[in-house]
Each structure stands twice: as C-alpha cells, then as structure tokens.
Amino acid sequence: AAFFNMCRPLELVFANGMDKGVQVGIQTGDVTKMNTFDEFYDAYKKQMEYCISLMVNADNAIDVAHAERCPLPFLASMVDDCLTRGLTAEQGGAVYNFTGPQGFGIANMADSLYAIRKLVYEDKKVSMETYKEALAWNYDKGLDEKSVADMSEMILKGMQDAGMTVNEDTAKAVLQTVMRLKPSDEQIQKFTELHDMIDEVPKFGNAIDDVDYFARDVAYTYTRPLQKYHNPRGGQFHAGLYPVSANVPLGGQTGATPDGRYAHTPVADGVSPSAGKDVNGPTAAATSVSRLDHFIVSNGTLFNQKFHPSALAGREGLEKFVALIRTYFDQKGMHMQFNVVDRATLIDAQKHPEKYSHLVVRVAGYSAL
C-alpha cells in the first residue's frame, strides 16, 4: 500500500509539472492561461492520473522485491491458501491479493477547487496570476524555513547543471540571499485580501451542495483510475481514503494550497473537513462526508470527529450522540470515530504524561495511550 497526497497534483498544475526545478509531473500548460475552470480542472485530473501511475509502479516494484528478497514463510502458514499453493503471501499465495493505497486531502481539494472556480472564474475577484503568486509566497506569511531551503537547493542545482562551481561558500551565499527575499508591502496587502476572500468562501463539512460535489468528484479522480490497475500477485488495486497520521508529515512537504492552507502545515485528515472549517455543527459535517461515494472506497475511509465532554454529558447528550451516528450510517456513510476530550487536558497531558495513564486518544485504526 501507499499514502497518496491529493494536494500534490494541484501543486504540479500550478508549476506545469515542475517540482523544485525537476519535471516530475506532466506538462499541463501555463495555469495563468487556462481560460475556463474546466480547463483547469482537467489539468488537475491529468496530473492526478499520472501521479497515480507513478505510485502504482512504485508499489508493484516493491511487491516484486518483497516476493524475491523478503518472503515470509511463517506469515504464509497463517494465511489461507498459501500452503495449498506452495507460495508465500508476497508471491501471490493468498486467496485475496489486493493492494490498498490510501488517499487523503479531499477537503483541501474540494475547498481549493470551489474557491478557484468562484473567485477566479465566476466572480472574477482575483486573477490566476495573483493566486499563483500568493501560493508561491505562502500568502501573507512569506517564505518559511523549508521553502527557503527548497529554493536554495533548486538554485544550487541549477548552478551545477549550468556547469558552475558550487562549494560551501556558494551554498551559504545563496541561502543568505534567499532568506532576504520578502514580499513587498503591496504584495502582502494583496495576499492578505485574497486569504480573507478565501475564508469567506463556503467550505466542505457544512452540508453545502456545491462544495460537497467537488469532494465527491475529487474522490472519484483518485478512486476510479486505480480500479484498472493490478499488482504482481494478481490482485486489484482498491482505494482507501484515510491517512492514519500521514497527513501531518506529508503536509509538511506540501506548499500552500488554494483553500487558504499555509505551506507545510497538516493536510486535512482522511475524509474529514479541514480543521476549523466545519462551522455548521457535527450533523452538517457528517452529511457532507456521507455524500462521498463510500461504495467505491473498498479499502476504507476515516472520518474523525471531536467533542468536548460537556457536549455529550447526561442522557440527552448520549441520545444526541446516538442519533448522529444513526443518521450518518442511514446516509450511507462508512466509518466514523471520535475523541471526547478537551484541549486543556491534551495540553496538560503533553507536559505531564505521568498524570494521564488513563487517557486514550483515537488516531486511525488504533488508539494512543
């Protein structure tokens, strides 16, 4: 299996397939010259399909390596049909031989696509040039430490490719130069205004049809292409939509996104709304998530909800909680899980873990003690 960050293909759209000076995606054209939203969205879908093909190739290469170099005979003794066939699980001896890569970032993509369609193509409040510039500068925040390091590395690589001598002094000089780069006051004002406009645009997780449509469709751009692929064990690829906790470190490798998310911050968790963007209550959030096509996500989904203990206190609180769960599954949701703990407790537990041996925090398929 693998983790698939659905924000990365959109980064490649804005960079015409380039990443840190390297052509890692396909060329989908200059984003500032895409005259319609459909043209922009098609570019995202093309980058998505190409990135999926890269992931499948990597997954299958690892499968072959495991079969040839790392067979696990003890595991085979406990997996149905391996002994009968005389093959380990890695060699295709199991009854079921699926590969299940997990995608995440649906909320970021739904919010990003909706914001771009509305602000750039429908209301024409901002140009795509300004949007692209704002993402490059991380909106009003400017370049963070990782962006500085990445840009310096790209410049040094370009110098080496051009035949220039690069040494420690050169690297220091480039780093210091990049660190001094800052957006102008005019740019900061422009990017702040854009970020404020993005904040006002409706977000996934509030039972708003148009935004929820994008979430459902973005999920399809990941799940449907995977269905045509098979692994060396003879099994089919089955999509999942859950990150465990990979949305945090992989978000740390992802630049700013058009939904207003700042560079190198966590990507949305599983099929859950982006943090703090579901402002119409838990029932609305559950309604939005239930509008995804859960039937095609045969490897599972992850929907996290968090409650303050007071929200579920007493019989009335418990009855509302039960009603929420029943409603979600009546609407064909697949999975939901909960944390019922207040922020102060979590912060204190970080400082004094010895006082909280009883504290359980649900993560994804497991709970942390």
Which ranges hold each PLM region?
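Structured mid-domain segments that build the active-site/substrate or prosthetic-cofactor binding neighborhood
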Residues: A1-M159, N167, S274-L369
